[in-house]
Regions:
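Catalytic core of pol beta-like nucleotidyltransferases
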Residues: 1-32, 41-46, 56-114
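Glycine-rich beta-strand-to-loop/alpha-helix junction loops that act as flexible
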Residues: 36-38
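Short beta-strand->loop micro-motif that forms the acidic, two-metal-ion catalytic signature
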Residues: 51-55
């Protein structure tokens, strides 16, 4: 898997991702963060969002997911970006139902370790 330094990102996207990654690792039980979607593939345009897969050590309820969304709000406003998150326990990503979905293949192929 490529690292974030190997991806051609605009400055505001890079800053937003760096801040989001730091905040998420410090504030939540995140095991791994992966950039995916058009930005990871290098096919983004001015309307593209930042897609982040957040793999957690445990299942998060709706309150935990909302806390992540709320925590990212200021970063989105500051940098003028939209950050979309897919939050999953790491065991579901590696062994659960997601292993057979097309999004799993896409992220395994094009995902970028953030």
């Amino acid at each position: 898997m490529k690292s974030i330094d190997q991806v051609n990102l605009g400055e505001k996207d890079r800053q937003a991702i760096d801040e989001a990654v730091q905040l998420l690792y410090q504030s939540f039980s995140i095991e791994q963060i992966i950039l995916y979607g058009s930005k990871a593939r290098g096919m983004d345009d001015t309307e593209s969002d930042i897609d982040l897969l957040l793999l957690t050590s445990e299942e998060l309820d709706w309150k935990g997911r909302n806390a992540i969304t709320d925590a990212l709000y200021d970063i989105q406003l500051t940098h003028g970006v939209v950050i979309s998150t897919l939050v999953l326990p790491i065991h579901e990503w590696t062994q659960g139902r997601y292993t057979v979905l097309p999004i799993h293949d896409e992220i395994e192929r094009y995902g970028v370790a953030a």
